[in-house]
Amino acid sequence: MTRPKTFFDISIGGKPQGRIVFELYNDIVPKTAENFLKLCEGNAGMAKTKPDVPLSYKGSIFHRVIKDFMCQFGDFTNFNGTGGESIYDEKFEDENFTVKHDKPFLLSMANAGPNTNGSQAFITCVPTPHLDGKHVVFGEVIQGKRIVRLIENQQCDQENNKPLRDVKIDDCGVLPDDYQVPENAEATPTDEYGDNYEDVLKQDEKVDLKNFDTVLKAIETVKNIGTEQFKKQNYSVALEKYVKCDKFLKEYFPEDLEKEQIEKINQLKVSIPLNIAICALKLKDYKQVLVASSEVLYAEAADEKAKAKALYRRGLAYYHVNDTDMALNDLEMATTFQPNDAAILKAIHNTKLKRKQQNEKAKKSLSKMFS
């Protein structure tokens, strides 16, 4: 018996990411596999609870994602985990629990208790043996595992685990029986700026976390792309690349580095947040400026010049959010490291002027209240 193959074409935040291909265990759980296949095919009719909504995954989202656990989808009626329907009726029974949750990238039915299967399902990110005997495994991912990891690593709402950017199933369908997974299917695609690294270091086949040189190459390659885009005034892309480098640094903490290697990493922990801060300033993302600049001030390798830059950029952020007291505090502190810096001195002058205007405005408001 040939196992059928279906696909999801995924976008994140409106940006296409590629295709996930599933192989369905129709030889083990034929009814459950058929349900999923028909929902991918999209021609099984309309939902009973919402007659204007087709029984199809197309256009629905991954509404619940928990890192190191699973990515859940399939609520095409309510988009929040409370809806969805099977092709048989709203719910159908647990077919069997033959296949165990013993590895990542398995496809398993979500439910609200025994015999409540509908259209919602999830992809495992790790082995989840505590789900054995409770959820029906009916397939696995055979292509697009890097996309599953990308979904897994999305920032999510802390209350409901919904990705902050929509992870959408733009299209879905059934593939020919003779479909073969391309040899380079899991290779990281190179984006239009030349970046071919995954968002997570440990998930990139080009990177060996035990090999310092491969880690450093990843960080410096992406950093250089960010700098190139900054020079072209493409600040949003530059910021994206610098933030990616920052994530690389924060997930890399080996214990056996040589002194010279430690110094290189520590220098990057200064230069990259400084770059994030200046990009964020250009984009008026002042909250990010405050966070990145503060990281520099706590960095072990930050010298006087770096501290002056961090205080200056943080001071400007405070200025733009109208906290002139904090702005002056930072800017004047910056002069202790760079006393003759014209940009810092100009910022101090502007901040004092702004504070004076704020005080005058406050006095006028008070006088009106008591007049």
From Swiss-Prot:
Matching entries from Pfam families are given as: Pro_isomerase
Biological-process GO terms, alphabetical: protein folding; protein refolding
Which SUPFAM superfamilies does this chain map to?
A: Cyclophilin-like (SSF50891), TPR-like (SSF48452)
The TPR repeat units are at: 219-252, 270-303, 308-341
GO CC annotation terms, alphabetical: cytoplasm; intracellular membrane-bounded organelle
- Catalysed reaction equations from the record: [protein]-peptidylproline (omega=180) = [protein]-peptidylproline (omega=0)
List locations, semicolon-separated: Cytoplasm
A molecular function annotated in GO for this UniProt entry is: unfolded protein binding
* Domain PPIase cyclophilin-type span(s) in chain numbering: 7-174
Its principal location?
cytoplasm
Q: Return the EC number.
A: 5.2.1.8
The UniProt keyword set, sorted, is:
Cytoplasm, Isomerase, Repeat, Rotamase, TPR repeat
User: What family does this chain come from, according to its entry?
Assistant: Belongs to the cyclophilin-type PPIase family. PPIase D subfamily.
Function summary: PPIases accelerate the folding of proteins. It catalyzes the cis-trans isomerization of proline imidic peptide bonds in oligopeptides.
Which additional comment does the entry carry?
Present with 18600 molecules/cell in log phase SD medium.
Instruction: Summarize subunit and interaction data from the UniProt record for this chain.
Output: Interacts with RPD3.
Q: What is this protein called?
A: Peptidyl-prolyl cis-trans isomerase CPR6
